Amino acid sequence: TNFNNRFNGRLHYNTSKRLNNGFIRLGHNVLSISDRDIVSTNRNLNDLKGTMALETSIINNIKNFNPNLIVIGHADSISLKTFDFIKSKKIKTCQWFLDPIGDKTPDFLKNRKRVLKNINYVDASFLTTDPHVLGPKLENTYYIPNPSDASFETLNNYNKKCVNDVFFAMSHGVHRGKLKTGKIDGREIFLNKLIKKNKNINFDIYGMNFIEPVWGENFMKAVSNSSMGLNLSRGKPTKYYSSDRLVQLMGNGLLTFIDKKTQLNDFFSDNEAIFYDNLN
C-alpha cells in the first residue's frame, strides 16, 4: 500500500500505518512495501510508469521474506504477473479499500472498478462501505470500520476545556496539500449555512474560505483545541461509509456529529455520538 514516504511526514497519519501498528501489536512480523513511493521514484525511459520496478520489488521481497499473508491496500499498479507469482506460492492475500463506492460519491464508478479489478485474485476484500453497495452476491467481501490506533489518536479532548467548539478540516486532495484556485467542494454550502445558523458557536474550519488545510502535527494541534467535530464526507451519504475523519475526531475524544443516513448508529449509541438528520 501507499505509506506516503515521499511526503516527508505530512501524511504520516494514515490507515496503512494504523493497520500495520495493529498487526505488530498482535505479535505479527510485518514487512511494508510502499507501492506508490516505488513507482514514483523509479520512473524512467525504460519504465515509464515505474511498474516494472514495483513488480521486481514485490517479487524479491516475497522471495526474501516468505510471508504467510499479503495485505493490499489501494495498490492499483500490481500486475497480473505479480498476482500469478503470489498464487503460485500459495500465499493468502486480502485487500482493503477505504475510498467511497456508494452512488453519487466522488469517483464511485472508478473506485468500484479498482476494487473489482483484484477481487478474483485475493481471498478476501474489506471495505469501509457496506459491501452490498457492490451487489448482494459478492463473495468474501466484508465491511471493516476505519481503524484507530492508540499511538496516533492520543488526545483526550473530553478531559480538557477547549477554546473552540466545532472542528472540521477538508482539502482539495491529500497529495496536493493546498487549496486549488477556483475549485468548490460541495460541502462548503452545508458548512456556510451551518455557520450562519449558529453564530453563537465558535467554529474552527480548515480547507475553505481561503483557509488552507492542515496536516501532520499542525492538524493535531488544531484538533486539540475543539470539544466537538463534524464528520462530513464528500458526496451522497452511504451506508456505513465514512472517511478516516471519523477516527481522527472520535479517537481524539471530540463529541462527533454524524449524518444519520450513514446508518453508523448501528454501531454507536446516542451516548457515543450525535446523529443528525439535517441542518435544523
Locate predicted features.
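A short, histidine- and acid-enriched strand-loop-helix "catalytic/donor-clamping" loop
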Residues: 95-108
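Short linear sequence elements within intrinsically disordered, low-complexity coil regions
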Residues: 88, 272-273, 280
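Glycosyltransferases and closely related glycan-assembly transferases
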Residues: 59-70, 80-94
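Nucleotide-sugar donor-binding catalytic core of glycosyltransferases
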Residues: 1-45, 51-52, 57, 65, ...
